[in-house]
Amino acid sequence: MLILTRRVGETLMIGDEVTVTILGIKGNQVRIGVSAPKEVSVHREEIYHRIQFEKSQQSIC
């Protein structure tokens, strides 16, 4: 795992096409913006797991 320190307004590049920008910090919450091509899915972890669960349920039926 890569661990980085970023300040508000700073950006992290993932590959050539995905950027993650720190938009704000308030208490223990960090607001981030993700810019990625349409073919790249971007989800919060809990949503991603829900999607995977629903896909597995559909394949069982």
Swiss-Prot record:
GO biological process, one term: positive regulation of translational initiation
Superkingdom to which the source organism belongs: Bacteria
Keywords of this entry: Activator, Cytoplasm, Repressor, RNA-binding, Translation regulation
Keyword Chaperone: no
Pfam families the record matches: CsrA
Subcellular location, record wording: Cytoplasm
Cellular component aspect of the GO annotation: cytosol
SUPFAM superfamilies documented for this protein: CsrA-like (SSF117130)
InterPro entries assigned: CsrA, CsrA_sf
Entry GO MF terms: mRNA 5'-UTR binding
Signal peptide: none
Physiological role: A key translational regulator that binds mRNA to regulate translation initiation and/or mRNA stability. Mediates global changes in gene expression, shifting from rapid growth to stress survival by linking envelope stress, the stringent response and the catabolite repression systems. Usually binds in the 5'-UTR; binding at or near the Shine-Dalgarno sequence prevents ribosome-binding, repressing translation, binding elsewhere in the 5'-UTR can activate translation and/or stabilize the mRNA. Its function is antagonized by small RNA(s).
NCBIfam families: csrA, PRK01712.1
PANTHER family per record: CARBON STORAGE REGULATOR (PTHR34984:SF1)
Quaternary structure, from the entry: Homodimer; the beta-strands of each monomer intercalate to form a hydrophobic core, while the alpha-helices form wings that extend away from the core.
Annotated family: Belongs to the CsrA/RsmA family.
Name under which the protein is recorded: Translational regulator CsrA
